[in-house]
Amino acid sequence: MAKHTFQTEVNQLLDLMIHSLYSNKEIFLRELISNASDALEKLQYLTLTDENLKNLQYTPRIDIHFDEEKKILTLSDTGIGMNESDLVENLGTIAKSGTKSFVSRLSGDKKKDSALIGQFGVGFYAAFMVADKIVVTTKKAGEESAYAWLSEGKGDYEITPCSKESHGTEIKLFLKEEEKEFASRWRLEEIIKKYSDHIPFPIFLHYTQKKNDQEESKEEQVNKAFALWRISKNELKEEDYKEFYKSLSHDSHDPLAWVHIKVEGSQEYTTLFYLPSKAPFDLYRVDYRSGVKLYVKRVFITDDDKELLPSYLRFVRGIIDSEDLPLNVSREILQQNRILANIKSASTKKILAEIENLAKDEEKYEAFFKEFGRALKEGLYGDFENKEKLLELMRFHSSLSPNKKISLQSYKERMKEGQKAIYYLMGENADLLQNSPLLEKFKKREIEVLFFDEEIDSIVMPMVNQYGDLPLKAINSAEADKDFEEESVSEEEKERFKPLLERFEKALSGEIKSVRLSKRLVDSPACVVADEDDPNFAMIKMMRQMGNALGDFPEPKPILELNPEHPMVGKLLALEDEERASDYAHLLLDQAKLLESGSLKDAVGFAKRLNAMLERAI
């Protein structure tokens, strides 16, 4: 017998399960049946691809036994089974990044934490909501040894060798007194039909029935056990689709929409894709796994292939079932398979069309974009084939709509007469951008400016130069300035302020690229802008946060722009005290940086200079 200690995250999860206040405890059975179905699908695939298992004879099925008196519930399957190391990995640690994300959200407040269970499938551990002891007996297909895993969910578990005739897994739950309803026929039937009716393997419920004063053992297949996606959509109800989504995704929320398509002709395949209503915790993790399963002629092949859909649609849940791929197709072949590439391209277009359809309902789409907009934006970076469609789906805050995001089409429809470009400003958040000095001239002209205020915008939006026939221009760029040449700085002004510019460049040497006059300001004395060939400030900040020290390149220096019409700038021109002029130069630069990014690198220096200036003024 080997005693093991649970990983810390597992202990946290178990503590939540054991003391759970979550009312919908019946989901534990959905989770266990789903795991059993996964085990059967894995074995089905291996019997086609693994030489050692090709001749394996077995009947794929899930069996459920119960004993009302003893309060014992037993679930078994004829799937792949586990060996000792599988038991440690699957039941003793948390390998799934999503589960780790779930655990990291736990607050210690039992009521709040229990509510999280409904937003996330917690797999095997959900059984501890209803059981105070669990015994798992398992044998891996193709191996001789069998093992028993036992735990009461109190920090450790035991693994011991045991005997088991055939491959597969049996899970025995010793139910808590108050959960004995889960050892009754009517309750189990109800739960199976509610959550697992469309599991593609038969689920048999075993019970005893009195006949002529004799106890007679019976078994009854409770679920329909058919591939829902293969049924004509005309024969399916809305409720059928919703139930199947929940069993497929472990999501307790209803999906927002779905697309069910059967394609016939030179290629034959069926797809069923769902748009979830809530984003999973780990959607933006590097190791996030796709939610789409690939089948060939109803045989499960993989759910871990990044070639099934583009990565920006990784939030989509669903099924691809092909008639043309070979059953023993390998993952390496999948990556270069023309049939799958065609399915991927057609599926992407269908999903985007459904999202476009969803966008007709403004309220629904606002909620959807809040959850998945960031992922969709990633498509602008790599999916050039669908770039125009994706642009129609984008939503942004703006100077006229700081609280509600708008489409590019909405912006276009309310452009000022004679306006020939879409103007934007990039930064950290809409509140900061709304108060940017760079907006002043545009507000005066009543020209709307889009806010690219998410981290992802600084990467993807520079790739978007055009919307229809309209160019996109950053308002701090020379390109945007050319649109208003009638307000450019005169030669006379340049000559008049030349001494001040030289003095500032000397005082700020090493901190800026240059100092110049600008007509883009109205009420502010100064602002900072990036040189045209340099990355924008938002991108610089994001790269710094990601730990990327901008590669081998030094951090780009900003350009300081002064407003020649501002009284303060005029007074600085007349100031003869070099030390004070230097302090003012630094203060103006710091103030401009603060308004641009909301933070300063040298806050202490800024405070000292500000205090010195106040001291002189008092």
UniProtKB/Swiss-Prot annotation:
Keywords: ATP-binding, Chaperone, Cytoplasm, Nucleotide-binding, Stress response. It is found in: Cytoplasm. PROSITE patterns: HSP90. GO terms for molecular function: ATP binding; ATP hydrolysis activity; ATP-dependent protein folding chaperone; unfolded protein binding. Residues 332-541 are annotated as: B. Residues 542-618 are annotated as: C. Residues 1-331 are annotated as: A. The keyword Cytoplasm applies. It comes from the Bacteria. GO terms for cellular component: cytoplasm. InterPro entries: HATPase_C_sf (IPR036890), Heat_shock_protein_90_CS (IPR019805), HSP90_C (IPR037196), Hsp90_fam (IPR001404), Hsp90_N (IPR020575), Ribosomal_Su5_D2-typ_SF (IPR020568). Homodimer. Belongs to the heat shock protein 90 family. Molecular chaperone. Has ATPase activity. This is Chaperone protein HtpG.
